[in-house]
Regions:
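Short secondary-structure boundary/capping segments
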Residues: 8, 58-61
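Extended terminal
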Residues: 17-23, 29-38, 42, 59-60, ...
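Gram-negative outer-membrane beta-barrel proteins
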Residues: 50-52, 132
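Short alpha-helical segments and helix-capping/turn motifs at coil-helix boundaries
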Residues: 2, 28-29
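Single conserved hydrophobic/aromatic residue that forms the stacking wall/gate
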Residues: 1-5, 9
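Short edge-strand/loop segments of extracellular domains
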Residues: 47
Length: 191
């Protein structure tokens, strides 16, 4: 197991994936476990960072009509308290096992893969912070204390990112969040 991989590796990792462009500040911890057959499992935890001027996220936010988050992204950036990525590398194909991010403005979950030929195929869900508050609010006793007064229903956007050089983004802007998405966020928030 390789723990605390160095800054050079971290910069190379961020530079090698087009959809990660725009990550600023924060701290990153990377752990890699080498497995047989030239495969590995890597865990990346990033804390207290901003996403800024990220074309794929800009497109998702604008189609999903998350205008407040879009304004922040185009300004100082969208702040995330924590993001976690666990992936398996098998035959030079990156398979996402778990990926999420939480912050005061947005939360997301992501799954998919990046093939050996650099073709990206990702699916995810994006929720504004008030949606996350509504999820937390449903936790018996503690939820209402933590989130204050009740807001509107639980809605978010789902998206797909596909392609090689020019990533194509599809967004379903009015998607009721699935129980799986809600369960993942409750699990994340309980950590």
């Amino acid at each position: 197991v390789s723990r605390g991989l160095g800054d050079v590796y971290k910069r190379q990792f961020l530079a090698s994936y087009q959809f990660l462009k725009g990550l600023e500040k924060g701290t990153m911890d990377i752990t890699r476990e080498h497995l047989p057959n030239k495969s590995s499992i890597t865990e990346i935890k990033i804390e207290n960072f901003y996403l800024k001027e990220m074309p794929v996220l800009t497109q998702i936010l604008s189609v999903a009509s998350f205008t407040g988050a879009l304004d922040i992204l185009e300004g100082k950036g969208v702040f995330f308290k924590e993001a976690f990525l666990k992936y398996e590398l098998v035959n030079d194909e990156l398979r996402i096992l778990e990926c999420y991010g939480t912050g005061p403005s947005l939360g997301f979950v992501l799954e998919g893969k990046i093939r050996k030929d650099d073709f990206v195929s990702l699916n995810g869900s994006l929720a504004p912070a008030n949606t996350i508050n509504n999820i937390v609010r449903e936790i018996p006793v503690v939820g209402k204390i933590l989130t204050g007064k009740k807001g509107d229903g639980i809605f978010g956007a789902s998206f797909k990112i596909k392609g090689k050089d020019n990533l194509k983004v599809e967004v379903n802007p009015i998607k009721t969040l699935t129980p799986r998405f809600i369960q993942r966020f409750l699990k994340i928030l309980k950590k």
